[in-house]
């Protein structure tokens, strides 16, 4: 028998009580600090009179607080109606499903609610897509805010509509899985409210191939031209993006649908497109296939 002194059993109840007291004291101190900050803001010496950093307790709460202003308001200019409340529903979905499935389901729900409230399909998809991406990134990254630029409904050469999503440089922070699932969510949402699929033209396909040849930033995987052509042709959503690099395209400089909101051509390399296709759709294709097969 060992002569070492006997180790006393831990008093679990006491430890639980001490932990609860510690968390309660943290909450009390936070309330005090926020009260002081609110009084300071009321002086009108800062840019805004409200505290910019809201409190959030979990993923559902963080997602709502992150996107509430302006993306959950039916009319962000008028603010005559309260924003959509998604916290409780998202929390319920996260209890029943994995995070990726919950992201898709809450994105569909937000899109339908926003479309019913506004009748604006573009805004409905925009709000739903950002909510889905926020859930995928734990609502702690800038990707849902700055990683997506314009979400637009544009026209194919035959006049039919399609969805175009502008991906920007900060989408890199989301990682390949969230980038690829962002495209999948966009496809699901455009189907939900009756927007057609993207039918790329030869110049639009060749433009992406040219950009990969010019892109000099780090990529985990740079697809060859043949693979790029397959992805662009088969993707039902247009992976678009803002110009991020200094290099200008030469062969396919001015291409229909690769334009800014005001109609001017985007002639330089679009880094967000490279990231989403290279690190997202190419590297995470098996994961996307798993979700598409499960969702039929």
Identify the meaning behind each predicted range.
Residues 1-296:
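Extended, Lys/Arg-rich, non-catalytic nucleic-acid recognition/anchoring regions
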């Amino acid at each position: 028998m060992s002569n070492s002194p006997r180790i006393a059993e831990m008093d679990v109840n006491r430890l639980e009580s001490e932990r609860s007291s510690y968390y309660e004291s943290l909450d009390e101190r936070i309330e005090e600090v926020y009260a002081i900050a609110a009084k300071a803001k009321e002086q009108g010496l800062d840019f805004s009179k409200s505290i910019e950093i809201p409190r959030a307790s979990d993923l559902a709460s963080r997602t709502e607080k992150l996107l509430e202003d302006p993306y959950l308001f039916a009319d962000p200019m008028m603010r005559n109606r309260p924003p959509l409340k998604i916290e409780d529903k998202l929390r319920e979905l996260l209890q029943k499903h994995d995070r990726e499935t919950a992201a898709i389901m809450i994105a569909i729900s937000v899109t339908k609610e926003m479309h019913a409230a506004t009748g604006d399909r573009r805004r409905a998809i925009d709000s739903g897509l950002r909510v889905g991406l926020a859930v995928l990134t734990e609502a702690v990254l800038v990707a849902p805010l700055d990683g997506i630029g314009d979400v637009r409904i544009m026209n194919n050469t035959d006049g039919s509509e399609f969805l175009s999503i502008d991906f920007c440089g900060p989408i890199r922070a989301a990682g390949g899985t969230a980038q690829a699932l962002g495209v999948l969510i966009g496809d699901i949402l455009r189907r939900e409210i009756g927007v057609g699929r993207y039918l790329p033209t030869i110049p639009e396909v060749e433009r992406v191939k040219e950009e990969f040849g010019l892109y000099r930033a780090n990529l985990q995987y740079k697809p060859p031209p043949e693979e790029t052509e397959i992805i662009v042709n088969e993707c039902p959503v247009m992976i678009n993006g803002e110009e991020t690099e200094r290099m200008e395209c030469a062969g396919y400089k001015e291409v229909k649908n690769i334009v800014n909101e005001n109609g001017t051509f985007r002639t330089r390399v679009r880094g967000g497109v490279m990231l989403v296709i290279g690190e997202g759709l190419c590297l995470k294709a098996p994961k996307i296939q798993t979700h598409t097969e499960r969702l039929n």
